[in-house]
A protein has these predicted regions:
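Cofactor-binding beta-sheet edge motifs in enzyme active sites
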Residues: 1-155
Length: 155
């Protein structure tokens, strides 16, 4: 990721680490659930889903800023660039690592069907994607008995 010339390394590293944590939350917990009766959004904020805490993010990030690049072509203040939002997508690496773990479990269980797994990779979605015997016994149909619908649905 190109951030131009760093004006303050500590701030830039903090921005990268913070954006990673935000991206991790985005790709693992910020799930959109809707009320089936009204179509209104149920998960309207962090009161309805878990945001990453200090125990959920890596203790050791190992962020390095490379120096010595020619930034003379940049026509910005002190040849710098914004660093706050670009690293947000680094959090997707967590999603893909979890997806690889699920694929390994599915191979172990003898499941050869293709895996369709969308973000966010919530614990529930990860567990259901494993397709083992316990998951098969716990499946809840989209339409319940007597034509009733679940409280919230995933679209």
């Amino acid at each position: 990721m190109d951030i131009g010339r760093s004006l303050n390394k500590a701030i830039d590293i903090g921005q990268i680490e913070g954006a990673f944590a935000q991206g991790q939350g985005w790709s693992t917990s910020e799930e959109f659930l809707y009320f089936p009766s009204t179509g209104r959004l149920f998960t309207t904020g962090p009161g309805n889903y878990k945001i990453p805490s200090a125990l959920d993010i890596p203790r050791d990030f190992r962020v390095e800023l490379l120096e010595g690049a020619d930034t003379s072509a940049l026509k910005t203040i002190f040849s710098s660039k914004g660093v706050g939002e670009p690293p947000l997508f680094l959090g997707a690496s967590v999603f893909f690592a979890l997806r690889d773990a699920v694929l390994a479990k599915r191979r172990q269980e003898g499941v050869s069907a293709p895996l369709h797994m969308e973000s966010p990779a919530t614990p529930e979605i990860l567990r259901m994607a494993c397709e083992d015997q316990l998951v098969q016994m716990a499946r809840i149909p989209q339409t319940l008995k007597d034509g009733k619908t679940p409280f919230v649905i995933r679209i």
